[in-house]
Structures are given as C-alpha cells and as structure tokens.
Amino acid sequence: MYILIISVIVLFLAYLRYFPLDYDEKKHFEEIDNQRKSDFYSVDFGKKYFNLWKKDKRNVFHSIKWFLEKKPEYNYEKGKYFPENKNIAKEELRNLTESKKDFIIWIGHNTTLIKTGEHFFLCDPVFSEKIFFTKRHTKTGIDPVILNEVFKDSKLNILITHNHYDHLDMKSLKRLKITGSIYLPAGVKKLLKGINAAEIKELGWWEHVESGSLKINFLPAQHYSHRISQSKNSSLWGSYVIETENG
C-alpha cells in the first residue's frame, strides 16, 4: 500500500515537472483577436466572473507547479529599481494632507494613499507583516495608528480592488477607524464582517459612484479572485479611475 502511495506521488510530481507553463505571446494575442465580441457584453455567467479579453485557462496544477518551483531570488540589481518606501511620521503626514497639493504615497506592497482636492483614498490597505503565511517584502510606510489620528476629523475612503489576501487583509481593515466609505467589487462585501464605515458600496465593471465633485469609476482588469471562503471568480475584481472637477 505504501509503495502504491509513494508511486502515485512520484508520478504526480513528475507530471508537474513537465506540465507546460510556457508563455507564447503570439498565441496569446491571436486568441484575444479571435475572442467572440459577445463575450464582452457581460462578465457574470452563472454566478462566475470572467476576464473580458481572454478566459483564464489555468487550473490547480498550474498553482501547485508554481508553488513547488524555485523562485528567482531578490538581488541588489533589482533593488535599484525599487521605489523608495520610507516611514512617514504623524506631523509629516498631517502637513501633507493640509497642503493644497495632490499626491499619491506608496505605503508598501499594493497599498497607496491618494489625495485629490479635499478627498482622501486608501487603496488595498495591508499593514500585516505576514499575509496567509507569506512574509511581506516591503516595510509599512505609515502606521495605521497615525492614519487614525490624522484622519480623525476628516473622511478617509477605502478602495478594494479584489479579494486576494494581500489586497484585502481583514486584520489591517480592523486596525483602521474608517471615517469615510468603502468601495469594493461585487461579491466582496459579505467578507467585511465587523467592519464599520459610513457606507460600504459594491461596484460592477463600468459602474460609478458620485461623491461631491468626484466620480469614482470601477473598471475592468485582467485578473481573477479566489479566497478560502469564496470559490474562484465568484466575486469580481477591477481597477479604479477617480475623476475630479479638473478631469
């Protein structure tokens, strides 16, 4: 019996070793050109979402192979192209928010703080040192305690792009005193148990919300969604475009 189990494992690993993962750019764009135009009309088929441009053909074998493969190591040469990520003190952040200049501050990983006019947005807030057993490779540029103090009397809105753990971290959201609204993709709101905000608004592709002089648009992105508590592509993913009175 043990020999049979070991044999199955060896055969499975051998299969993964030679499982094709090569990317063919020419074939990729040929498939996009041949995509049926009717596929662009809707993104929700039978409670599952799909990419508009090209359906995802990856499966569990791709994920296992990627997990088992040796990853390229981070080195100094790559580090030279890495954006600067420094710790921002409370007074420095307060001065930035009170200035008339708009800004985008990279806080680390996928988290950014955006100021446009008198409006503030925190995109995909992640402050945890580990996300789903994976240690982060960038330090956190702003302590959430500082964010809570600086935005105590003003609205800080939250933008969530999709449900992956390194973009939607419940521990990080619970550390924030959210004074504004939360905008997120369709199907993700159910995950936000115990999160308080002035408004929690789900959006589908091409939908928008108007807030004062702002128009917050939720647009398509080539990606996917998956979480232990949500099956693959059962919730949406996307990108944001914030329109101001100046364009």
Task: Tell where the protein language model's regions lie, with residue ranges.
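Active-site metal-binding motif and surrounding structural segment of the metallo-beta-lactamase
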Residues: K37, K55, K135-L184, A198-E199
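Metallo-beta-lactamase
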Residues: M1-E149, E243-G247
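Short, polar loop motifs at secondary-structure junctions
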Residues: G108, P185-L191, G204-W206
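Catalytic core of the metallo-beta-lactamase
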Residues: N110-K115, E210-G247
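Binuclear metal-ion centers of metallo-dependent hydrolases, dominated by the metallo-beta-lactamase
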Residues: Y2, L13, N196-G212
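Structural motif
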Residues: H119-F121, N157, S181, L214, ...
